[in-house]
Every structure is written in C-alpha cells, then in structure tokens.
C-alpha cells in the first residue's frame, strides 16, 4: 500500500477538489453537480446522456436542471454522490480506487451517519484498500504550516470555526453556521431582483454565482460605502450575460457578502455572523490559549476569497478582543484549496501510515470504526 499514491478528495458542497498526495495543487477541480435534461431530447438519433456531471453539466446547464448532492456540508443524495466519486476516480483522475488509499474530508459537527455511510461506500462500492476521513478546517491549518490557530472555513454549504492548539482541535469550541456561498448566491439573486433582473432556474442561479464570484467584495466600512454608492457610480460594474445582454451591478457588489457580517440586518436570518462565530469559538477555549488563537486566525474556503474580507474580519475581531492582544488574520492567496493541500501534506507524512482505516479494520469492526480512528 505504501507504494501506491494516496488519492486526496475534498468533497465540497459546491466544488470537488481531487488529486494526489504530495502534490501542491489538486489535479481536478470541478463543480459538485449533476445535471439532468429538463426535456426529452429533441434531437432524434443523437445520443444524449440522461445525466451530466461536473464541468459538462455546467457547460450544458441551459437545458438541464442542476442538482447538488451535498447541502450545507452534509451528503443528502447518496446515489448522486456515488456518481460524483465515480467520476472523480475514473474520469478526472483516471485511477482504479481499489489500488489507492483515499483521504476524504468533511465538515465538523456533521451527523455521525454521514461519515459512516461515506466509509461504507468507499470500502464496499469502490473497494479502497484504506481510508481516512479528516475534518476540513484541521487540514487548512496544516496547509498554513501551523499547529495552533483558529480556522474560519467558509465554503459553499457551511461556515465553521475550529480552534486548534498544538495540532489538537478543541471540540467543545467548534462552531458552525449554515450560512455560506450558496446562501450568498441566493441573496445576490434577491438583490438583483430589486434592480429588475430576475434569475430563478437552477441554471440561472449558476449565472448569479458567477456574478457574485467575479464582482463582489467586502467593504471595510459598510455604511460609508453605502453612502458613497448613492452619491456616485464608483462601485458600478458591468456584467455580460450569456445571451449578450449587459447588466450593471452597483452596491449589490458589497451588500451581498455583508450578509456574512450582518445576517440579521441584511437578510433577516438569526444566525451568528462570522466575526461572532470566530470570537465565541475563541472565548470557549481555555484562557491560556486564547492569545495564540487571536494571533493565528486563518481563513480558508472559497467564500473567504472576497477582496477585503481579511481586513474587515481583523477590524471586527479587534473591536471585540482585549486591547493588549495583537490580532492577526492570515489569508493566503490560494486558500480555496487550503483544505486539499492540507490533506496532501498530512498523507505524505511518514507518521500518517498508522492512521489509516484498512480494509481489515473495516471488515472486522464495520463503519463505526471511523469514529475511533478518525478523530
């Protein structure tokens, strides 16, 4: 087994990142989606598939209904998820899963059944020789080259904060909110509706996601930015739709990600903001470790890619933290792949060899072994 390269798969709610242990970046990055035709094929004799996965579904989205098997970090549709894993191994990476140990990732505080079922499918459907399921945020810290810090990981389905001290996560202080990229996309669609631009179908929501990813940023001072947006056209940017129409996006560019910082005011959701989530997680930890955590706030995940988010989080945390503490927010440029890179690093360590759940472990103990071996 040692001579076979480990396959590292970061199953995001929105994007799958997959590749080989020891490499710097994932070889395959594709949307975690399955597209099924809305209508029966009008092209007689043309061989049209009944479903498309990943990039192909994205390209043909105009005639498809788009399904996401993972919602808020939890796998909701196991049949579709199996298809995505199948696509990952055989099409994207071109490997036989029964020849490679596999590392999968998941969000903290997921239902136990989620990781048990993942384990069962990997051993029984894909016959992997060995498996490990790692918590996403812990891997992000590895990729930042640290063993102590608090990770704020915001992806497409879930945002979570995980304090880690000397390599151990502090479970009682871990927190998560169901507010992440996909919710921002829905909110962006709502803001665009105010302007008279209506996006409703699953394919149109993909356009909204693209607008959000390309044009949004986080304002350091939201009120000042709003005032400025009423007085001038500084923030206006054009976006060309697939049909050639051009729409103008103004203050929605920063109103959308503001949802992360003010869920209640922006969209009536009684959820913790990302600054409260981070601050409360730190406060839940022992008083002796808090300073180290404040000095190592690490951002990870695609929803932390907005310009200005690091500076804004720093400002919000500084307002809450004791004055004597020098708060530091670390935002590496390729943090959307931080989880994957951490998995690649972790599995290349010689000390990791004893961590795997082997096929024998699984046959002997069943899927519940995952709770004992993967902490």
Curated annotation (Swiss-Prot):
Annotated disulfide bonds: none
GO molecular function terms listed in the Swiss-Prot or TrEMBL record: ATP binding; hydrolase activity
Catalyzed reactions per annotation: ATP + H2O = ADP + phosphate + H(+)
Subcellular location: Cytoplasm, Cytoskeleton
Keyword Nucleotide-binding annotated: yes
Broad EC category: hydrolase
Keyword field: ATP-binding, Cytoplasm, Cytoskeleton, Hydrolase, Nucleotide-binding
The protein's name: Actin, cytoplasmic
Function, in words: Actins are highly conserved proteins that are involved in various types of cell motility and are ubiquitously expressed in all eukaryotic cells.
Enzyme Commission numbers on file: 3.6.4.-
Coiled-coil zones: none
Family membership: Belongs to the actin family.
Organism expressing this protein natively: Sterkiella nova
One CC-aspect GO term: cytoskeleton
């Amino acid at each position: 087994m040692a001579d076979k390269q480990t396959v590292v798969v970061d199953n995001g709610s929105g994007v799958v990142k997959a590749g080989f242990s020891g490499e710097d970046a994932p070889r395959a990055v594709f949307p975690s989606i399955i597209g099924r035709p809305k209508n029966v094929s009008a092209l007689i004799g043309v061989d049209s598939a009944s479903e498309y996965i990943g990039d192909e579904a994205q390209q043909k989205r105009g005639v498809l209904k788009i399904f996401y098997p993972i919602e808020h970090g939890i796998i909701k549709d196991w049949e579709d998820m199996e298809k995505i894993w199948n696509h990952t191994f055989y099409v994207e990476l071109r490997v036989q899963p029964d020849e490679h140990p596999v590392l999968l990732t998941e969000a903290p505080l997921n239902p136990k059944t989620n990781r048990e079922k993942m384990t069962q499918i990997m051993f029984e459907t894909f016959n992997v020789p060995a498996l490990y399921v790692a918590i996403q945020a812990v891997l992000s810290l590895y990729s930042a080259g640290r063993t102590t810090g608090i990770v704020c990981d915001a992806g497409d389905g879930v945002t979570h904060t995980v304090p880690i001290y000397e390599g151990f996560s502090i479970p009682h202080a871990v927190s998560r909110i169901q507010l992440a990229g996909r919710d921002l996309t829905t909110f962006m669609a709502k803001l665009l509706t105010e302007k008279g631009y209506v996006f409703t179908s699953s394919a149109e929501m993909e356009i909204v996601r693209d607008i959000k990813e390309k044009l949004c940023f986080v304002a350091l001072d939201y009120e000042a930015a709003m005032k400025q947006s009423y007085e001038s056209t500084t923030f206006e940017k054009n976006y060309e739709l697939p049909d050639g129409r051009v729409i103008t996006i103004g203050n929605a560019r920063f109103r959308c990600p503001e949802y992360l910082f003010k869920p209640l005011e922006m969209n009536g959701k009684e959820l913790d903001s990302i600054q409260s989530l981070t601050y409360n997680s730190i406060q839940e930890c022992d008083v002796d470790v808090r300073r180290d955590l404040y000095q190592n706030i690490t951002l990870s995940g695609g929803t932390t890619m907005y310009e200005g988010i690091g500076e804004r989080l720093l400002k919000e945390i500084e307002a809450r933290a004791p004055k004597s503490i020098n708060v530091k927010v670390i935002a590496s440029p390729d943090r959307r792949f931080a989880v994957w890179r951490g998995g690649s690093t972790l599995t290349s360590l010689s000390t990791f060899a004893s961590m795997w759940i082997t096929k024998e472990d699984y046959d002997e103990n069943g899927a519940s072994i995952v709770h004992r071996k993967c902490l």
